[in-house]
């Protein structure tokens, strides 16, 4: 299993987008997106790290990205519109590496960006969302989509309250696996190990065919 990540750049309409790639053998891969850039979110976020670790330990190629305007990614914050294109560019980049089974995972704002663009992401097989910020950004656009498989929330999360998320699950996908981490707020300090375990358990229980 590949153990190290390398910095990569890929282009979208003239913008250079930065990512960290850990390339493992085989077709399985995941793109991981970060929380809100205007509140300090980037690809080095603790929750992003936990998601990446769970996937890497199961021999998935992982690609976490900095949205436009973050870190060494060019451009500027685009209210989630251009950020959807950043995700699409990342998915296309993985296809160029001959990855054919691609998951899409996001935390907070990253989960919202992923959901907004999901209908246009034909490459995506499964979607994982950690703390979709339903009390901060509108999610009414999100209709039934069987690709949404796992949602994680903290019991004390006021930005993605589990009670609000619970009411939306039947619309998103009645078969979603919904996990609540007790004692966690939106930032999961001291709780990222539990995120890692839940994502790992989900991956272990799902047959990818590879």
Which role fits each region the language model picked out?
Residues 10-12, 16-97:
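Serine-hydrolase catalytic machinery in alpha/beta-hydrolase-like enzymes
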């Amino acid at each position: 299993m590949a153990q190290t990540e390398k910095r990569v750049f890929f282009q979208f309409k003239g913008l250079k987008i930065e990512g960290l790639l850990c390339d493992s053998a085989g077709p399985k891969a995941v793109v991981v997106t970060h929380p809100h850039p205007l509140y300090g979110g980037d690809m080095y976020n603790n929750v992003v790290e936990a998601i990446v670790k769970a996937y890497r330990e199961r021999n998935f190629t992982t690609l976490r990205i900095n949205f436009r305007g973050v870190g060494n990614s060019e451009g500027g914050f685009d209210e989630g519109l251009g950020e959807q294109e950043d995700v699409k560019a990342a998915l296309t980049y993985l296809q160029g590496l001959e990855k054919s089974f691609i998951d899409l995972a996001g935390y907070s704002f990253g989960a919202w960006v992923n959901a907004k663009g999901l209908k246009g992401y034909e490459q995506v097989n499964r979607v994982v969302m950690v703390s979709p910020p339903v009390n901060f950004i509108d999610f009414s656009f999100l209709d039934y989509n069987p690709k949404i498989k796992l949602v994680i929330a903290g019991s004390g999360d006021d930005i993605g309250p589990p009670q609000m998320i619970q009411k939306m699950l039947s619309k998103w996908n009645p078969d979603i696996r919904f996990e609540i981490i007790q004692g966690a707020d939106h930032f999961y300090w001291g709780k990222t190990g539990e995120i890692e375990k839940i994502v790992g358990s989900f991956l272990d229980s799902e047959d990818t065919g590879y």
